[in-house]
């Protein structure tokens, strides 16, 4: 997930998931009528689409857009086959949502910036606030950075399903 996110950032020259989606030819739709849906990714007949709740704020919009872009980059074949919808429908424990969250963390949160804030003594809440992000996304990023060789203390396990718990 890290390499795919870094390649996209380099190719598109931005960490902005909506600009990247546009560069990749992914159509983004907004709907203000979604009650419990934050976002969704679909791929039908070579048409890649992201559907976003139009009421998302400045923290949630980039996060959900990056998460759905993660599904495009990591799970397009599953989305094409329709199996991704079954995973969501039956709330099966699977790795697709966590992988999309990890991708979003790599896309939105720069390793060196996170590392510098942690070295300055910022806690997870302060890092999330400083980077205009969500605490769980920062926790996922810290875990992934440890796997990349950074030596960071992750105080608690992130809730990989945190996007599902948000209500607009």
Q: What is the predicted role of each segment?
A:
Residues 1-168:
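Active-site hotspot residues in diverse enzymes, especially metal/ion-binding acidic/histidine motifs
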């Amino acid at each position: 997930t890290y390499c795919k996110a870094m390649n996209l950032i380099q190719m598109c020259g931005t960490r902005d998931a909506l600009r990247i989606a546009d560069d990749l030819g992914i159509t983004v739709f907004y709907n203000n009528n979604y009650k419990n849906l934050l976002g969704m990714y679909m791929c039908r007949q070579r048409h890649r689409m992201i559907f976003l709740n139009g009421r998302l704020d400045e923290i949630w919009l980039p996060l959900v857009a990056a998460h759905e872009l993660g599904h495009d980059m990591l799970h397009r074949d599953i989305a094409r086959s329709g199996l991704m919808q079954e995973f969501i429908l039956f709330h099966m424990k699977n790795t697709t949502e966590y992988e999309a969250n990890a991708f979003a963390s790599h896309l939105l949160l720069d390793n060196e910036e996170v590392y510098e804030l942690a070295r300055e003594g910022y806690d997870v809440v302060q890092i999330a606030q400083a980077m205009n992000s969500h605490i769980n996304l920062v926790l996922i990023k810290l875990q992934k950075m440890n796997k990349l060789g950074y030596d960071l203390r992750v105080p608690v396990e992130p809730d990989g399903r945190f996007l599902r718990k948000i209500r607009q």
